[in-house]
């Protein structure tokens, strides 16, 4: 089924041995539009404020009760690799998460992690290499432009709970007197300018 992703922001995130924090944001691949990670605000029980969990460690969200559950203990979460969520996630950081969470994953996603490597071998990596991972929260407020001009403001994402794919953008279109929400397929996105905060569509909205 399809759900508004923003309904989960601020919702409890529960480990197998108790609540660990709340949903801060989600990280998605800006090429496949698939959610890859959940960013959890863990409050004060860890020295760091946020932890990043692969979706492969999560159950389907409980939309009725607005809760996310992980197949991890709080100790496993606390010992996970430290990722600065205010900066783009590097390939090196994702390899560290893959190495740590891989054996803990409750299911396998074809787009998560790296190809299998023989024991003892390391993945070739350049420290500066950055993945195409973006925060859903950081994109809210971006201008959405069609081929025939300005269309609206990005207000959210609609996700398929089975695939974690962001199939639609929730766009507020029109002026303050006649604004309306329009669902725009992500397959219509031509490009995203992170510097200019613009989502460009290759489609007319007239």
Where do the model's predicted regions map?
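Peripheral interaction segments used for macromolecular assembly
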Residues: 1-206
């Amino acid at each position: 089924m399809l759900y508004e992703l923003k309904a989960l922001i601020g919702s409890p995130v529960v480990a197998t041995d108790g609540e660990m924090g709340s949903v801060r944001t989600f990280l998605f691949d800006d090429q496949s539009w698939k959610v890859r990670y959940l960013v959890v605000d863990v409050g004060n029980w860890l020295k760091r404020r946020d932890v990043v969990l692969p979706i492969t460690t999560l159950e389907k969200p409980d939309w009725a009760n607005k809760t996310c559950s992980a197949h991890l203990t709080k100790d496993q979460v606390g010992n996970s690799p430290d990722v600065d969520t205010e900066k783009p996630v590097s390939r090196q950081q994702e390899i560290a998460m893959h190495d740590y969470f891989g054996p803990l994953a409750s299911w396998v996603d074809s787009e998560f992690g790296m190809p299998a490597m023989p024991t003892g071998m390391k993945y070739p990596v350049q420290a500066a290499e950055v993945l195409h991972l973006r925060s859903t929260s950081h994109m809210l407020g971006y201008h959405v432009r069609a081929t025939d001009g300005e269309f609206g403001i990005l207000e959210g994402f609609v996700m398929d709970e089975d695939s974690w794919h962001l199939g639609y953008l929730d766009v507020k279109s029109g002026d303050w007197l006649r604004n309306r929400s329009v669902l725009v397929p992500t397959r219509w996105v031509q490009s995203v300018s992170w510097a200019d905060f613009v989502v460009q569509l290759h489609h007319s909205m007239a």
